[in-house]
């Protein structure tokens, strides 16, 4: 029997060769910062590559959101991952959230993002790191970094242009426009709604 790692802020299950990672900080709308979700995602990616019983990894969110991305309260208060000067924040970013795309790109099985609600900012980028995205009718997608006066630094700009082309990715990044699941399917961001 395969031992599934115990995670802090996410749930990991394995059934019929399908590993399901559920981001479980619905009180924070599954924000990646201000929680242990970054470590949980990286731990899961490493475990999947060592487990012969996994054929696919599904990532989803608990509650009403897939992931709100960064913790806006911490950003506003310049606390948590966003405390300190620019150099300190940049260092925490590299040692924190930027570990996610590095870990997921090395996963040797297909990754499916089951987007159950809003995927905003780094949450949208997390969905874009998957090989396939399936969205519920409640899903919304937004590359909203510019609305906060920041740029996507967790791989989102690179992943999105691979999915939908440079021009459309540039438009979504520069406008911060939030799109619904239907438009996301029309653009080729999601496979099915």
Indicate residue ranges for each PLM-predicted region.
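Crotonase-fold acyl-CoA enzyme core
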Residues: 102-193
């Amino acid at each position: 029997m395969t031992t599934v790692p115990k995670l802090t802020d996410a749930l990991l299950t394995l059934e019929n060769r399908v590993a399901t990672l559920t981001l479980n900080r619905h009180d924070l709308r599954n924000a990646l910062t201000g929680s242990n979700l970054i470590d949980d995602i990286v731990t899961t990616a490493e475990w999947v590559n060592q487990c012969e019983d996994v054929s696919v990894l599904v990532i989803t969110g608990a509650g009403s959101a897939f992931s709100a991305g960064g913790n806006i309260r911490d950003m506003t208060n310049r606390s948590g991952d966003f405390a300190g000067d620019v150099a300190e924040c940049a260092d925490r970013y590299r040692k924190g959230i930027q570990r996610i795309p590095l870990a997921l790109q090395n996963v040797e099985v297909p990754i499916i993002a089951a987007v159950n609600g809003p995927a905003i900012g780094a949450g949208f980028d997390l969905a874009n790191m998957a090989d396939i995205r399936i969205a519920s009718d409640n899903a919304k997608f937004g590359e909203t970094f510019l609305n906060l006066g920041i740029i996507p630094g967790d791989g989102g700009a690179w992943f999105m242009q691979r999915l939908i082309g440079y021009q459309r990715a540039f438009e979504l990044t520069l406008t911060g426009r939030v799109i619904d699941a239907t438009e996301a399917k029309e653009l080729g961001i999601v496979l099915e709604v």
